[in-house]
Amino acid sequence: MKVLVICAVLFLAIFSNSSAETEDDFLEDESFEADDVIPFLAREQVRKDDKNCIPKHHECTNDKKNCCKKGLTKMKCKCFTVADAKGATSERCACDSSLLQKFGFTGLHIIKGLF
């Protein structure tokens, strides 16, 4: 019974995280018209294309919303401040899975190992 509850919680956490990211883009302006939806749908079609998305651990500084999907969830662009040899700092971003997704996948592998 405990295993079933843990699996259900992990599934809900991963599902809510993957669905919340697309809803955030869509619900920014609640009073939208059909003219506003068409560019949004066109942009989503481009993002779904595997050839145009940014793979894991690749640079996404200039295009933060175009990370590829990994399984059921979409990776996020994470930014870091990097200092070079001269001491000048710059911001670098790379596509990576969120911490919640990493915990979910680790838990899933542990549960699979039990069976």
Curated annotation (Swiss-Prot):
What are the annotated disulfide bridges?
Answer: 53-68, 60-77, 67-95, 79-93
State where it is primarily located. secreted
UniProt KW keywords? Calcium channel impairing toxin, Disulfide bond, Ion channel impairing toxin, Knottin, Membrane, Neurotoxin, Secreted, Signal, Target cell membrane, Target membrane, Toxin, Voltage-gated calcium channel impairing toxin
Q: In which tissues is it expressed?
A: Expressed by the venom gland.
Write down the Pfam families for this protein, in alphabetical order: Toxin_35 (PF10530)
Q: Kindly indicate whether the keyword Disulfide bond belongs to this entry.
A: yes
Provide the transmembrane region boundaries: none
| Cellular localisation | Secreted; Target cell membrane
Task: Quote the record's domain comment.
Answer: The presence of a 'disulfide through disulfide knot' structurally defines this protein as a knottin.
Instruction: State the family named in the UniProt similarity comment for this chain.
Output: Belongs to the neurotoxin 19 (CSTX) family.
Q: How does it assemble?
A: Monomer. Interacts with CSTX-13 (AC P83919) (Kd=370 nM), but does not interact with CSTX-1 (AC P81694).
Return the protein name.
Toxin CSTX-9
- Species, as recorded: Cupiennius salei
